[in-house]
């Protein structure tokens, strides 16, 4: 773990961190932070059967607290940092919008990964062919002898990779339009950006 990532983890100590939506990105990311002794809350409108028994057991073993069901967002006013899932946008969800108005930090797994990733980032987006292009680039890097990781919109969380990545590695990220909507103001952009194509919807 690089010093920058260690400083990031240290900056989160003593803060209440909520993950809204416990899907393929947020559940592993919540577990990653909880394993470092941080105060993490898992929020989802669905029950534990959706998240998965094994995942829930792992989260609880690391001290993660749950807020599930109809009123799953009720704890948000108490949080310092809110990680939203890709499908929950600030301008569409009043609870998330109110968090921003109160001055709470609202972010996402991918935004935090971009901020603190020490590796070279290759970002791939577009209307079609994202997963194929992302996978091809990853396999080409591996074949050429580079150390690389793959994830993002194709169903793999990137934040846990911060544990082991170094400046000589590559992070190959598939990015959806929903992820990019709130990433425009980030100082840290991809080292290489790939746009497969753009179609109107």
Task: List the predicted regions and their residue ranges.
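N-terminal leader/targeting and accessory segments in enzymes
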Residues: 1-108, 112
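Phosphate-binding loop of NTP-binding sites
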Residues: 74-77, 90-201
